[in-house]
């Protein structure tokens, strides 16, 4: 799939701080496990092409909450960031703080099965992180949380994705059914103490555990396409918080 590079222009420089306006408190349950394939992404996700205009505006919600016409509202920037093009902090899955080294030996969840994680009160019966283990909830308050696998898939299936630049940072402008948009920067991921693929890929945790091995679901994208796939829990990834409508 051919994608044209686009330069994004920010509409505002509003700082992203915790705002609870318009947010509910109910957590969504997890549906059956399914992996998004490349063909599905190409069929249901509109990506920028040669007919797109040269410069696009990226809308930023004044309350730092963007209602894109989906099942949940999305934050305008990553957890720990003050602008939408910043990566914020990187987290291992089920952990609450950034760290200098991301590996299996110091991971709080990597070595455990989902059954064990339920017993340790890390996840619920739907394999979703409990609020006490959800970094977005702990950092921003009870109305915020990490997106589920289903919500990440909804973001892919129902939104228009356009690869380009915002303030010199590569990433995707994601526009919802109602025309509202967010920007997801391509800021890579941590393995060990090394940051990989910055400006090449975006790597975002969901709150949903994968039922095979030491993995959980993540929203990953490159210039080619976005997808939801399993990833080792010990790796450091960005988090884009959501809240209920």
Question: In which residue ranges do the predicted regions lie?
Answer:
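Bacterial N-terminal signal peptides that target proteins for export
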Residues: 2-12
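Repetitive helical segments and hydrophobic/amphipathic motifs
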Residues: 16-18
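C-terminal motif of bacterial Sec signal peptides marking the signal peptidase cleavage site
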Residues: 21-22
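Hydrophobic single-pass membrane-insertion segments
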Residues: 26-27, 74
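Short, low-complexity, disordered segments immediately C-terminal to signal peptides
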Residues: 27-41
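Intrinsically disordered, low-complexity repeat and linker tracts
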Residues: 45-57
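C-terminal, surface-exposed recognition/capping segments
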Residues: 58-61, 67, 72-245
């Amino acid at each position: 799939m051919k994608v044209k590079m686009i330069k994004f222009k920010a509409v505002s420089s509003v700082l992203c701080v915790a705002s609870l306006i318009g947010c509910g408190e109910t957590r969504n349950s997890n549906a059956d496990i399914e992996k998004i394939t490349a063909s599905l992404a190409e069929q249901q996700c509109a990506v920028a092409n040669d007919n797109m205009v040269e410069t696009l505006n990226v809308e930023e919600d004044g309350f730092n909450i963007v209602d894109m016409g989906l099942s949940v509202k999305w934050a305008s920037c990553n957890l720990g960031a003050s602008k939408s093009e910043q990566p914020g902090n990187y987290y291992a899955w089920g952990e609450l703080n950034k760290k200098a080294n991301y590996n299996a030996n110091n991971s709080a969840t990597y070595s455990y099965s989902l059954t064990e994680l339920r017993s340790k009160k890390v996840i619920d019966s739907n394999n979703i992180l409990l609020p006490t283990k959800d970094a977005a909830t702990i950092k921003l308050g009870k109305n915020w949380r990490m997106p589920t696998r289903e919500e990440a898939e909804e973001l892919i299936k129902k939104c228009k994705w356009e690869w380009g630049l915002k303030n010199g940072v590569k990433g995707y402008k994601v526009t919802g059914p109602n025309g509202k948009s967010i920007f997801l920067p391509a800021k890579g991921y941590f393995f060990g103490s090394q940051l990989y693929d910055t400006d090449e890929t975006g790597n975002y945790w969901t709150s949903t555990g994968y039922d095979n091995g030491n993995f959980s679901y993540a929203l990953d994208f490159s210039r080619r396409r976005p997808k939801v796939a399993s990833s080792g829990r010990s790796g450091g990834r960005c988090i884009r918080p959501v809240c209920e409508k």
